[in-house]
Amino acid sequence: MKLLAIDSSILTNTSVSRQLTRSFVSRWQKIYPETEVVYRDLHAQPINHLSQKILAANSVPSTQISAEIREEMNLSMQLISELLSASVLVIGAPMYNFSIPSQLKSWIDRIVIAGKTFKYVDGKVQGLATGKRAYILSSRGGFYNAEPALNLDHQERYLTSILNFIGISDITFIRAEGVNVGEEIRTQSLHQAEAKIQQLLQFQMA
């Protein structure tokens, strides 16, 4: 079994989402010690945003592609391979300005590729990254799980939509909300998220 773990927070020691991904992966490995973990830190090793040159490279002769762009194309194929070969996807995704970090968006733009992770059949989209479970470790400074703030959530809704689009429908969100409201709420929210991780993985063992 292969697990692909991704961190996207620009914070390091104080990151809530990183704390949760570490906890999740550590607990998972104790249950499934044979798991091969592939880890990507999108802040420490950022992926360049998709550019016109990278996009156009798929439709020009290879002799016309520069070494720099060829390296970018190879990276895209590596990212897609990491995703498709994984049975489990774990993403640390903090909410930034009601959405996701640009670092995570760069990764998404590299793996959502026609003919690789989705295709069109009779005019309808068919995801090709099927048979996977996704766990999203979500952190939010405020509370966005109820009206009226619910309408400001372009983080979890977007991630659900894009993963569904490429064929991943088994998605579980584990969130820590209100982490910037106050220290007491932050601690309580983290404890609740950790408890949910433990509960989920205990259920996996049953």
Swiss-Prot record:
Catalytic reactions on record: 2 a quinone + NADH + H(+) = 2 a 1,4-benzosemiquinone + NAD(+); N,N-dimethyl-1,4-phenylenediamine + anthranilate + 2 NAD(+) = 2-(4-dimethylaminophenyl)diazenylbenzoate + 2 NADH + 2 H(+)
Q: Where, by residue number, does FMN bind?
A: S9, S15, V16, S17, M95, Y96, N97, F98, S139, R140, G141, G142
Q: How is the co-factor bound, per the entry?
A: Binds 1 FMN per subunit.
Q: Per the record's keyword annotation, is Phosphoprotein included, yes or no?
A: no
Q: Identify which cofactors the protein needs according to its UniProt entry.
A: FMN
Keywords recorded for this protein, A-Z: Flavoprotein, FMN, NAD, Oxidoreductase
The EC designation for this entry is 1.6.5.-, 1.7.1.17
Top EC class of this enzyme: oxidoreductase
GO terms of molecular function: electron transfer activity; FMN binding; oxidoreductase activity, acting on NAD(P)H as acceptor; oxidoreductase activity, acting on NAD(P)H, quinone or similar compound as acceptor
Which InterPro entries does the annotation name? Flavodoxin_fold, Flavoprotein-like_sf, FMN-dep_NADH:Q_OxRdtase_AzoR1, NADH:quinone_OxRdtase_FMN_depd
Protein function? Quinone reductase that provides resistance to thiol-specific stress caused by electrophilic quinones. Also exhibits azoreductase activity. Catalyzes the reductive cleavage of the azo bond in aromatic azo compounds to the corresponding amines.
Q: Could you say which protein family the record assigns here?
A: Belongs to the azoreductase type 1 family.
Give the quaternary structure: Homodimer.
State the name under which the record lists this protein: FMN-dependent NADH:quinone oxidoreductase
Q: Which organism is it from?
A: Legionella pneumophila subsp. pneumophila (strain Philadelphia 1 / ATCC 33152 / DSM 7513)
